[in-house]
Amino acid sequence: MAKHRSNRLAETLKQEISQLIREELKDPRIGFVTVTSVEVADDLGNAKVYVSVLGDSQQAKDSLDALKRAAGFVRSEIGKRVRLRHAPEIVFKYDTSIEHGAHIAQLLRGVKQEEEKDEGESHDQ
């Protein structure tokens, strides 16, 4: 039961925090940020918000720093928007899964090209 509730809250937080970042946060350091997932502790006291940032590593670092500084504001807004007795503590984390997936895709393309090259050479002989 508690897991179901935390999953439901995680999805709600993802939507609300995405909207807050898009519409309310005016920090110029925040670039094109996407909330990829939210993990809420079973006691609903903490929420890890995973974000990805479009741009280079410096833009990602700047955006994450700005989000961390705005965590208190985000928490207070969540408390107003979502009916909870206590709003969870918000912690922003950089999500590297998209970069990791792109790296794996690049490696797979390289393997495929090598295989095609090897097949082409074996047919020539």
From Swiss-Prot:
One of its GO terms (molecular function) is ribosomal small subunit binding. Keywords: Cytoplasm, Ribosome biogenesis. InterPro entries: KH_dom-like_a/b, RbfA, RbfA_dom_sf, Ribosome-bd_factorA_CS. GO terms for biological process: maturation of SSU-rRNA. The keyword Cytoplasm applies. GO terms for cellular component: cytosol. It comes from the Bacteria. Its main location: cytoplasm. It is found in: Cytoplasm. Belongs to the RbfA family. One of several proteins that assist in the late maturation steps of the functional core of the 30S ribosomal subunit. Associates with free 30S ribosomal subunits (but not with 30S subunits that are part of 70S ribosomes or polysomes). Required for efficient processing of 16S rRNA. May interact with the 5'-terminal helix region of 16S rRNA. Monomer. Binds 30S ribosomal subunits, but not 50S ribosomal subunits or 70S ribosomes. This is Ribosome-binding factor A. It comes from Desulfitobacterium hafniense (strain Y51).
